[in-house]
Amino acid sequence: MDAGDASRLGESLDAVSAAFQSRVMELQELVLARNMYPATAIPDLAAVDVSLTAMEAQLQAVRRRLQEEREAFPKAKKLVQQSLKQQRRLQLMLANMPTGMREDVFATPLEHNSSMMFPESLNFSSAVPEVRDHDLKIKEEPTAPPKKGRGPAPRWYISTEELDSLSSYMRGRLTLEKVNIAINEVASYADGNAHLVACPKKKLSEDTWEKALELRDIAARESVKGRHFFLETDIKGPGLKLDTTGKAILTVLRHLGRFQETRIGHHRVFILSKQQ
């Protein structure tokens, strides 16, 4: 609804109010003519007056609401103009962004969010003038190559077919759920060790730093280098413990190739395998 519609609606309400008041006056005259005695006419007139007052209050409320909406039009128009101006600025920034920085931006989830914030229907290409290299030159600074993290530890869950392929004495009372819960736990142990190996000294306590040094020595071994591992001393449940069931699970996982086992120093080291 624009300002013209609001003005016409206000005029219509004024006309309705005038007609309503004229009708009330006619009703008052009819009430006076109908009643022979003033004692009975006064209550009727009082009831009409109350109804009229309520209707006038409602009409005033509608009129105030229309006035508020009419005053809000300039503010809304200004807000739209500012939004369009900001969109043009963002488009100019994007057009002149260094190549390396642009790759970093579009490699993040912000790309999806920006596509939701600025749909194709806005058509920035028609609203923003083309900016050439000689109009606005930005010196591109060399960007450091992204650091390659080791990634999460492999979680190579077993299938029902693999569990059924085991001999009955090896499988025992193990279930698919128990074994896969254990796989998830040993992967979390390996993730924790990888974090300690990569964490700088200033972020670790003295006791934790000693363990981190020990893990770094193990991680530097040729048979372990670049792979996720956990130690026998890391195993502490609840899904995997060093009891009869836990040892049976470790035997099954080793048999199915989920890890390789070796001994480094006084540690029994389990090196996780990636899914083939």
Swiss-Prot record:
Residues in coiled coil: 48-78
Gene Ontology BP annotations: attachment of mitotic spindle microtubules to kinetochore; cell division; chromosome segregation; mitotic cell cycle; regulation of microtubule polymerization or depolymerization
Protein name per UniProt: SKA complex subunit 1 homolog
Keywords for the protein's UniProt record, in alphabetical order: Coiled coil
InterPro entries associated with the record: SKA1, SKA1_MBD_sf
Gene Ontology CC terms: mitotic spindle; outer kinetochore; spindle microtubule
Species: Oryza sativa subsp. japonica
Molecular function in Gene Ontology: microtubule binding
